[in-house]
Amino acid sequence: RAAADFLATVNLGSKPQWEFPLSPFPRPGGRATRVIYTEYDLPRETIEPHDVILDKDGFAWYSNFGEQNIGKLDPKTGKVTEYQVPEHKPGFPTGFLALRADRDGDLWLGNMYQATIVKFDRKAEKFSYWQLPKEQNIDAAQLNMVSPQSSHVDGKVWAQNNGFAGVHRLDLASGKIETWEPFKTAKEPHNIYDV
């Protein structure tokens, strides 16, 4: 509480007092503080889970930071099933960061230095891929975050490119990827972390 009270006094604005008073929620207690942690063994020591999400059926899906696969863990049995993603740029680093689901529960990933947007259809257990156009598919291209959450509205999936601070928009109907580089003429380096 003392730290929160102090931080609430820090004001670098032109007004002498914040317009929004500090109103912290009460600390949780009782049942809200009971937590059970369960650890699961993965099939190889080299697996580096980055993001983990639960689907509506209770399976835990993870992106693998250092390898070209995603994994599905059944928390009831501990069984892990891996799905191999082919390389699209042999010789470039592999792996994934963000793992997100669309409204249908299908999984989307940015295949980092492979410069590919990846969709995994959970029911069919099949991948679809969209590789960046040649002019953006440079050595530094790095697709980390893919955002399909509103793709059911307009058929568009957004992605960010950490390699050159770009934003991509995939049109699912045509497969065309549009690119914006808002910091292309900036004098200092910039980055776009997420969309």
Give the residues covered by each predicted segment.
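Beta-rich, blade/repeat-based domains predominating
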Residues: 45-57, 88-104, 135-155, 185-195
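A short beta-strand motif characteristic of beta-propeller blades
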Residues: 38-42, 79-89, 126-139, 176-185
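A short loop-to-beta-strand structural motif that recurs across blades of beta-propeller domains
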Residues: 69-72, 115-119, 165-169
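Conserved beta-propeller blade signature
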Residues: 59-62, 106-109, 156-159
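Short loop/turn segments that connect beta-strands within beta-propeller blades
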Residues: 74-78, 121-125, 171-175
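A short helix->beta-strand "capping" segment at the edge of beta-propeller domains
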Residues: 24-46
